[in-house]
């Protein structure tokens, strides 16, 4: 068990700056979103602004700043974790830890996914909590379905970074990168209405 904790500590040293910067930006963006929302409520009144969100065409996507935030967090964590291993050839040192290679790579992936889960739990949880205090369920439920898709995309992009960085074959790297871009594009269509991804999210 000790080698796994040593591995986690090594990964933490590499990724802590990216993680805390992403978390700070994420929480700051949520604060900024709701400062804007409260200003609009002050100017228009709560009822008028809520009706504007529900019935305007095109829709008022007041939370649009969240769209690429989980993606950027996952990219920064993934790059800080895997690029030094490959670019500086540290992966050879990592492979000399007294752990099987499969266990090693699973541990690295688990660590990264755990960081992304913590980021998502804090930022998304904070956003949904603030949202529920300001808007009725007619707004909060469709909005929740929409932003879930964006936060789930972070897991995909992290995995594709890991696959691409650790793959020694250039053609497979290209295949992983192109496949990743195609899959990720499904998460970032323009949102035509609140709850646009409701049928495909829990």
Region annotations inferred by a language model:
Residues 2, 69-72, 76, 84-88:
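Generic alpha-helical scaffold signal
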Residues 3, 88-92, 159:
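Short, well-structured alpha-helical interface segments that form or flank functional binding sites
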């Amino acid at each position: 068990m000790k080698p796994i904790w040593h591995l986690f500590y090594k990964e933490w040293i590499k990724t802590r700056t990216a993680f805390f910067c992403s978390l700070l930006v994420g929480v700051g963006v949520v604060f900024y979103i709701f400062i804007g929302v409260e200003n609009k409520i002050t100017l228009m009144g709560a009822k008028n602004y809520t009706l504007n969100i529900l019935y305007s065409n095109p829709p008022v996507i007041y939370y649009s700043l969240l769209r690429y935030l989980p993606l950027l967090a996952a990219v920064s964590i993934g790059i800080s974790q895997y690029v030094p291993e490959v670019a500086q050839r540290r992966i050879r040192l990592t492979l000399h830890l007294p752990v099987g290679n499969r266990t090693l790579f699973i541990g690295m992936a688990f660590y990264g996914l755990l960081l992304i889960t913590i980021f998502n739990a804090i930022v998304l949880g904070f956003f949904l909590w603030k949202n529920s205090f300001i808007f009725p369920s007619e707004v909060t439920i469709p909005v929740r379905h929409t932003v879930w898709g964006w936060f789930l995309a972070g897991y995909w992009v992290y995995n594709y970074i890991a696959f691409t960085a650790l793959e020694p074959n250039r053609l497979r790297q290209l295949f992983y990168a192109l496949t990743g871009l195609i899959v990720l594009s499904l998460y970032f269509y323009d949102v035509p209405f609140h709850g646009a991804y409701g049928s495909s999210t829990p």
